[in-house]
From Swiss-Prot:
The lineage of its organism: Bacteria, Pseudomonadati, Pseudomonadota, Gammaproteobacteria, Vibrionales. The keyword Amino-acid biosynthesis does not apply. It holds the Pfam family SAM_MT. The gene is rsmJ. It comes from Aliivibrio salmonicida (strain LFI1238) (Vibrio salmonicida (strain LFI1238)). It is found in: Cytoplasm. It is an enzyme of class 2 (transferase). This is Ribosomal RNA small subunit methyltransferase J. Keywords: Cytoplasm, Methyltransferase, rRNA processing, S-adenosyl-L-methionine, Transferase. Its EC number is 2.1.1.242. It comes from the Bacteria. One of its GO terms (molecular function) is rRNA (guanine-N2-)-methyltransferase activity. The keyword Membrane does not apply.
Length: 260
């Protein structure tokens, strides 16, 4: 994929080149999107809209850290959806990892989470944020033990993983496909910015429905699909149950009991 590759710390130029090689990125000077390696982090900028600021993965501070400390623990909806409230600590595969926020919440509650992100730029951002979190004195130990990013950034990532001899099937597959956002629905400024940038970078998630069938084959216990409250069921399949929040719901497709 082509994108502008910029390094603001001359001592890290070789790191940027390694990132480009790892994720199949080539430099395009005129691209409206820039992947920028600063002294602190890897970030994405939309060059024609500088006021939007940069997007980067921060699992150590800010909103993610606040949610880890004060977000409700195993009583929160996402925890119930994956079965944490049933005394189990499932192995979770997050098939649409994005910036890693939901995966981080599940990992902070004890789950081992394998993350898959198919878009190479988003995967590069997530990989950088994960690396920084692993080196953090406070959370680095359990992040290193519980969170991993799988190199599967194509449309049939789930099928590819199932074909690998050493792949361990997860108890739960978690999906949060990007969904068109109606103008009349309120979102935070940060989420609006990220959605706007991602939807123009990644494009519409038109094949999201195709994720459900392989996810159901992969998960030994259940598939959890996060949807906006106004969205239809994924692939028009009715879930076994739904857990609703103010703005979203978690559609749960049960393959087996959590303790079976």
């Amino acid at each position: 994929m082509q994108i502008a590759l910029l390094c603001e710390d001359l001592n890290r130029q070789s790191e940027l080149e390694a990132i480009a090689t790892r994720w199949g990125l080539t430099h395009d000077e005129d691209n409206v999107f820039a992947l920028v390696l600063t002294t602190q982090q890897l970030e994405l900028r939309k060059r024609d809209e500088p006021k939007l600021g940069a997007i980067f993965v921060d699992l150590v501070s800010g909103a993610v850290a606040h949610r880890r400390k004060f977000g409700g623990g195993k009583g929160q909806s996402i925890a119930k959806a994956v079965g944490l409230n049933k005394g189990a600590t499932p192995l979770v595969l997050d098939g649409t990892a994005g910036l890693g926020r939901d995966a981080f919440v599940l990992a902070s509650l004890g789950c081992k989470v394998q993350m898959v992100e198919r878009h190479p730029v988003v995967a590069a951002l997530l990989d950088d944020g994960l690396s920084r979190a692993k080196h953090d004195a406070d959370i680095g130990g359990w992040v290193s033990q519980r969170m991993s990013l799988l190199h599967a950034s194509s449309h049939d990532a789930l099928e590819q993983l199932m074909a690998q001899d050493d792949f361990v099937q997860p108890d739960v597959v978690y999906l949060d496909p990007m969904y068109p956002h109606p103008e009349n629905k309120k979102k935070s400024a940060l989420v609006k910015k990220e959605m706007r940038v991602f939807q123009s970078l990644v494009g519409a998630d038109n094949d999201a429905d195709a994720l459900l069938a392989p996810a159901l084959l992969m998960a030994t216990k259940r598939v959890v699909v996060k949807r906006p409250d106004y969205a239809e069921w994924l692939d028009n399949q009715k879930p076994s149950m739904a857990i609703e929040t103010k703005k979203n719901r978690f559609d749960v497709y049960v393959n087996a009991g959590m303790k079976s």
